[in-house]
Amino acid sequence: MTLQAQLEALRDNTLKEIAQVATLKELNQIRVETLGKKGPITEVLRGMKNLSPEERPVVGGFANEIRDLLTEAIEARKVVLENEALNAALKEESLDVTLPGKQMPQGTRHILTQVMEEIEDIFLGMGYQVVEGYEVESDHYNFERMNLPKDHPARDMQDTFYISDEMLIRTHTSPVQARTMEKHDFSKGALRMISPGKVFRRDTDDATHSHQFHQIEGLVVDKNVTMGDLKGTLEVMMKKMFGEDRKIRLRPSYFPFTEPSVEVDVSCFKCGGAGCNVCKHTGWIEILGAGMVHPDVLQMSGIDPTEYSGFAFGLGPDRVAMLRYGVNDIRNFYQNDLRFLNQFKVKE
């Protein structure tokens, strides 16, 4: 009998055995005896050394087809036998379906997720789009497109996790803005966007610093955008976040990607400006940085700064949550202690 004929006979006999087997143990025995290292298929393959070079690929391919066919048949029969065993077990059990089931604990959205969604909803209501981007970024988009060339001294302001000379874990969500600006079709209208997400810096973790935290950056680019537009937008946001009687003030500052740049303070929502430990008895809380988009940043995105202008801002939802809920240690947000997190549980 030729090797191919042996394989055909093995196939037919094994398929009959598989169809007739009644237990998983017997099925496994067939699998071991037929497909194992000492099984007949292996023996056939070993006998191929006596075949001519022309016959070997034909018989070898046929043997592999038989092995695949039998493997599929065994798996199909296994499913049938498992279902039969399950049905038999269920028939033997006495189950009172009226008994109450086990109450599964229900989770809820993390407090930082709640705060971020609240901020996103505010800006969605003002016509902004939410755009997310890569956490692993290129040096080009993270720094150079933000007016921070390789020799710029302001790079010392941020310690960065580098993956290679040109790739890093983003230090802010600004790269999302750069990528969006270069793709936006201004013939269809202004660009209004926020870019939420995780950012990473080489900070030593303590009560107020974390190597990983969240950031939401906003950007508007259009014709005739002014600092007044920026101030009005942030006033609306602060009133919705902290109360209608909130006021903001702008203080001159410096950021490489905006000119002019400002630090934005909000009147204390705890004491109403009278002075307390939250505002350090000043009546004001530093809340975010902002400014008018630097002309160089616009130009690098293919936008004519003589025709278009824009404003940008960035705030930390982690800090907003700490201020709003009186959390003194940022690490509490990330330690997964349910005793802490359940304080902020909301009904879904």
Swiss-Prot record:
Binding positions for Mg(2+) per the UniProt entry: 259
Cofactors: Mg(2+)
Cellular compartments annotated: Cytoplasm
Chief place where the protein resides: cytoplasm
Superkingdom assignment: Bacteria
Gene3D superfamilies registered for this protein in UniProt: Bira Bifunctional Protein, Domain 2
Keyword field: Aminoacyl-tRNA synthetase, ATP-binding, Cytoplasm, Ligase, Magnesium, Metal-binding, Nucleotide-binding, Protein biosynthesis
Record's catalysed reaction(s): tRNA(Phe) + L-phenylalanine + ATP = L-phenylalanyl-tRNA(Phe) + AMP + diphosphate + H(+)
InterPro entries: aa-tRNA-synth_II, aa-tRNA-synth_II/BPL/LPL, Phe-tRNA-synth_IIc_asu, Phe-tRNA_ligase_II_N, Phe_tRNA_ligase_alpha1_bac, Phenylalanyl-tRNA_Synthase, tRNA-bd_arm
Pfam families according to UniProt: Phe_tRNA-synt_N, tRNA-synt_2d
HAMAP family the UniProt entry points to: Phe_tRNA_synth_alpha1
Family note: Belongs to the class-II aminoacyl-tRNA synthetase family. Phe-tRNA synthetase alpha subunit type 1 subfamily.
Description of how the protein assembles with itself and partners: Tetramer of two alpha and two beta subunits.
Name of protein: Phenylalanine--tRNA ligase alpha subunit
The species this protein was found in: Enterococcus faecalis (strain ATCC 700802 / V583)
Chain's gene name: pheS
